[in-house]
A protein has these predicted regions:
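Amphipathic alpha-helical repeat scaffolds
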Residues: 35, 128-134, 246-251
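Glycine/charged-rich beta-loop-alpha catalytic/anionic-binding loops adjacent to active sites
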Residues: 22, 113-121, 230-239
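Active-site/ligand-binding-proximal alpha/beta "capping" segment
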Residues: 193-243, 247
């Protein structure tokens, strides 16, 4: 068993703490995650665990020890750390005693086995990590088959995205691509429905049956011209109040569940 790590200057701790930066996640090919439920979901998904840091002094109840036992059944390296070191690794105000490091999960559009009846979420260069995490969580709940991010975009493995996804990041294929033309060529046969507050059919009147690629715009600029050119119909969410717009994650959730309702009997 490895000795307890008590210094934040330990090389493993130094490298793990760098994972809050995108460039280091990409260089190392890995990312950090925490939260007991989220980590259970990661293990259930088969995500490859590289390292686990734990501090028994911060465990509360039986769930953390049970989770640690699950990690011991993997090929991950397991390290006991002091409370101060665990707190330095954690993004949470009240750490639950476990932080795990996983391999980055990379998927391509070619890896999707699609029948044409799926719901796909296409995000046009999203920039807010919290919004992306919420969209991932909602897409997972709605039964979407994948979330596709047109780049440049926020990193899906940003700590805020990982946390706000509540583990759904491990359940859904997340595809990143800059090739808009190739992307929409792969979506031939899908209805390409764009969300727009100002024009198009009221969302309840749109045809959400069968295969739909729901396209959501950038938080500040909406849908870009190059992406808009592929949209075959528009869904609007009319607003009766004084707000200028809906949060993209909220709007996306409403539209995802329009697809769910339309396909309940399939």
């Amino acid at each position: 068993m490895n000795p307890t790590i008590t210094s934040n200057r330990n090389p493993r701790i130094v490298e793990a703490r760098k994972l809050d930066q995108r460039k280091h996640r990409q260089q190392q090919g890995r990312f950090a995650a925490e939260g007991l439920q989220l980590l259970h979901m990661a293990l259930d998904s088969g995500a490859r665990t590289l390292e686990v840091f734990f501090c028994e002094a911060l465990f509360v109840g039986d769930e953390a020890p049970a989770l640690l036992a699950r990690f011991r059944q993997t090929d991950a390296e397991i390290f006991a750390v002091s409370p101060d070191v665990l707190r330095a690794l954690s993004e949470r105000e009240s750490p639950q005693g476990l932080v795990a490091i996983f391999s980055l999960i990379e998927k391509s559009i070619d890896s999707l086995a699609m029948t044409g009846g799926e719901l796909l979420i296409v995000l046009d260069r999203p920039q807010d990590p919290g919004n992306l995490g919420t969209i991932l969580r909602t897409a997972d709940a709605a039964g979407a088959s994948a979330v596709i991010c047109i780049t440049p975009c926020v990193d899906p493995f940003d700590p805020k995205t990982v946390r706000s996804s509540m583990g759904s990041l491990f359940n859904l294929p997340i595809i990143q691509t800059a090739d808009v033309t190739s992307l929409f060529a792969h979506l031939d046969g899908f209805k390409i429905i764009g969300a727009d507050a100002k024009h198009g059919e009221i969302w309840t009147r749109c045809d959400w049956r069968n295969g739909v690629a729901l396209v959501l715009g950038n938080e500040a600029r909406g849908l870009s011209d190059d992406v808009s050119s592929y949209v075959t119909s528009w869904a609007s969410l009319p607003m009766s109040g004084k707000a200028e717009s809906l949060n993209v994650a909220i709007a996306g959730g409403i539209l995802m569940y329009a697809w769910v309702e339309a396909n309940l009997t399939r």
